[in-house]
Amino acid sequence: VGMSISGLIMQKLCSNKFVSPSTGATISGAQLGILLALIIIPSSSMLVPALFAFVISLLSTLAFVFFITRIRLKGPVMVPLIGIMLSNIILGITNFIAYKFEATQTISSYLTGSFAGVVAGKYEIVYFVVPLIVLSFILANHFNIVGMGKDFSKNLGVNYNVILILGLCICSLITASIVVVVGSISYIGLIIPNIIVMLKGDKLNGTLVDTALLGSVFVLTCDILGRLIIMPYELTIDLIVGIIGSILFIALIVYKMKYGNKALNLKEVKNDEKDDI
């Protein structure tokens, strides 16, 4: 639920359907933050790694936004490629620090998504996602306005920078809370929002609930497949999501390049958004 909604908000704020926590350096930043917390304060509670993960993931996401706002080539594929390159740089730094401090085994569980470590006393931090999702619903109209551009937001009396940073903070907090508990799960924040947008348009008020529900069903399905394929052993959910997500991601890129800018927004609501505003 959290990853799907984070992806939907990031896509709206960045005005690009291929932006998500995995392609926007948010997840890799959270992983680096967790590693730093485990090295600096090794015997701390789950709140400390979550706090470190939030700060570093927010900085990584802001760096990503900084880069994409200053490049001239802003094609639908170029923006996520920049995010992927930035994510790989951060991941390389994470692996280097882990190797330097002999923490490779410790950080490995956070680099791969799995529900195996979800036990009592560890998963409770995910509850922080609930008020953040509620806040996302409250600010949905503001995110819609910011997604239309800085000048449009200014004309409607919305502080563009404040709403943009607030939206990125929500996405970073959600991502950090999830990565601390289950590790990295890619593609959920990328694929699920695009599917919903293709079916219902990109107005956040009408897509947040559907995105959350489809994200939950998708993750649950992948988890069941991971438990059934090689019973009695279990495949990590990140592996199953990665395989299915990679295929869907390539299909979306091809579809976008073939049909143009309206390919992923077949039912875009134009007049309704202006009326609501």
Predicted regions and their residues:
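Alpha-helical transmembrane segments in inner-membrane proteins
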Residues: 1-277
